């Protein structure tokens, strides 16, 4: 369905810079509005409600703490005891046994360990050839960086399967600053509500002493899509309305499609900023065991004060995986998304194509709802219609027969990592040298910023099978030292958005440590974009980050400035 997208691409590029406008709302459960007493339900009913309302989150992950995962079967070769080290300088051979394939015609002698390429130059990292820019009217050559980038950028229309509910019309719309695949200042909206369950298993919407908290999604899932395709008005045949448009309930009219008003007050609300996808191929190449070891090291070094949570999530592309039955899917340590929803870039692409653009595909074949209500009457491509994949007619590809999700994943795998700014670092060398040291030593090494914002990680070697044996790491991604400034774990640093997606209720107050590479290109910081300066973002931290924040507060004003100057160079 790519041909219909070409005419819209030029128009899309012309209007891309127009900002979206959002109403400011409460950004965490801490600002939740309380009502008068609400009806009570049993804990079993509450759990059933929580499980049944989240239609948008197709699969869920399991909690997998470091203490339960001393050795991961993807991360250690059979017959060895190699448990990896995440510190590339102390143990550069740490990530050396991730289901390794012996050298053969596909796997010549691997290159020595080296730094991952980092630049904003719109060039391949070597996973695929560069190719040539796609001329107007052409569909490009897939399997090249330029061809894959073109598909990543193409605008989807209704005839392509857009919607009926969606947030954007292309991947690039949310990932484009300063180059295609990078961050942007665009948010998505999520909502739900909390139930409070006492020791007798009775739950209500009223907080109570000693009660446990159970998050429940808004109808249809926590994601509230910003856009909806035009839908036909019943009594005005020539005109169209917006009956699939989602809003945060309560809604007191029945103006949305079907059924009565939605009266539940979804009091937990949050924005989520779009994430950087540059360098994601290197993140995908990190061994499970490396991430588990980081979590274990944090807990040991800080006496349990800092304790990143590892969760394992289904890898959708593994043969035999049914995304609707997570138990059928092999799992890997999550690392993509604010809640570590995915571990592979193909699974991540499939999820985003449905939830952000509204296009069903091979791994997510059912449309999202509009606040829990079917959009089938307004869907030009019914879920019940079998659409064969171009590459394999025996498989159903939904609204993506050309499998654009493969191009999305391949493009992200081929991007270079976000670079640091050498000009800033040279011009302010003396100050930034001190700032860098403070980042790793303030107030001490155990509780510094770098305990979570890990500066360096080594990827698995080339010829390592990852993602349940579906992807063989090439030389371009293997044995690479990356500088992401993240541990890719879930933490409670006092800014959790109150939303549960993966890993169960204990993740409600947790978020993935955002990588700081390229952070100087973002002017709205933290998960919700509510912090506008580095100082504001630092001071919002609490919880596990309390020792580091107290250390920052105790710094002289000159040293605070030096630390921020270092961040401004990343």
Model-flagged regions — what are they?
Residues 7-20:
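Bacterial N-terminal signal peptides
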Residues 20, 27-34, 38-45, 52, ...:
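Periplasmic c-type cytochrome electron-transfer domains
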Residues 1-5:
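Positively charged n-region of N-terminal signal peptides that target proteins for export
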């Amino acid at each position: 369905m790519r041909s219909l997208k070409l005419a819209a691409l030029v128009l899309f590029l012309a209007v891309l810079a127009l900002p979206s406008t959002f109403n400011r709302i409460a950004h965490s459960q801490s600002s939740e509005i309380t009502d008068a007493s609400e009806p009570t339900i049993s804990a079993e009913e509450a759990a059933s409600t929580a499980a049944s309302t989240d239609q948008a989150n197709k699969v869920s992950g399991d909690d997998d703490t470091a203490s339960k995962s001393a050795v991961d079967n993807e991360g250690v070769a059979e017959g060895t005891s190699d448990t990896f080290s995440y510190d590339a300088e102390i143990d550069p051979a740490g990530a050396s046994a991730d289901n390794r394939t012996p050298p053969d015609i596909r796997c010549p002698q691997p290159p020595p360990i080296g730094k991952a390429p980092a630049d904003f130059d719109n060039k391949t990292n070597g996973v695929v050839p560069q190719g040539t820019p796609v001329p107007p009217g052409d569909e490009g050559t897939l399997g090249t960086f330029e061809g894959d980038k073109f598909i990543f950028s193409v605008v989807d229309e209704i005839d392509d399967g857009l919607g009926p509910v969606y947030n954007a019309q292309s991947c690039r719309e949310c990932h484009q600053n300063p180059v295609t695949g990078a961050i942007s200042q665009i948010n998505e909206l999520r909502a739900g509500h909390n139930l409070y369950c006492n020791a007798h298993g009775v739950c209500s919407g009223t907080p109570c002493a000693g009660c446990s908290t159970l998050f429940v999604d808004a109808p249809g899932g926590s994601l509230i899509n910003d856009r909806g395709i035009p839908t036909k008005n019943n009594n005005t045949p020539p005109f169209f309305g917006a009956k699939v448009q989602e809003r945060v309930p309560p809604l007191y009219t029945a103006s949305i499609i079907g059924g009565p008003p939605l009266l539940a007050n979804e009091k937990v609300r949050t924005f989520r900023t779009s994430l950087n996808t540059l360098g994601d191929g290197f993140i995908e190449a990190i061994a499970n065991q490396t991430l588990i070891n980081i979590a274990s090291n944090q807990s040991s070094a800080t006496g349990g004060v800092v304790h990143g949570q590892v969760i394992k999530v289904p890898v959708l592309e593994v043969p035999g995986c049914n995304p609707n039955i997570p138990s059928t899917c092999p799992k890997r340590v999550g690392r993509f998304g604010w809640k570590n929803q995915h571990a592979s870039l193909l699974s991540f692409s499939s999820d985003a194509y449905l939830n952000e653009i509204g296009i069903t595909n091979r791994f997510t074949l059912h449309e999202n709802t509009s606040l829990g209500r079917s959009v089938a009457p307004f869907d030009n491509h019914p879920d019940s219609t079998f659409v064969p994949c171009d590459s394999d007619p025996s498989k159903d590809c939904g609204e993506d027969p050309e499998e654009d999700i493969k191009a999305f994943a391949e493009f992200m795998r081929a991007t270079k990592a976000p670079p640091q700014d050498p000009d800033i670092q040279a011009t302010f060398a003396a100050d930034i040298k001190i700032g860098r040291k403070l980042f790793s030593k303030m107030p001490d090494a155990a509780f510094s910023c770098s305990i979570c914002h890990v500066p360096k990680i080594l990827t698995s070697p080339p010829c390592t099978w990852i993602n349940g044996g579906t992807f063989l790491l090439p030389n371009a991604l293997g044995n690479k030292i990356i500088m992401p400034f993240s541990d890719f774990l879930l933490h409670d640093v006092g800014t959790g958005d109150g939303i549960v997606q993966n890993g169960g209720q204990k993740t409600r107050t947790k978020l993935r440590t955002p990588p700081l590479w390229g952070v100087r290109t973002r002017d709205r910081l933290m998960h919700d974009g509510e912090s506008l300066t580095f100082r504001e973002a630092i001071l919002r931290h609490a919880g596990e980050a309390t020792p580091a924040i107290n250390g920052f507060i105790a710094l002289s004003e000159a040293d605070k400035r030096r630390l921020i100057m270092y961040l401004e160079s990343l």
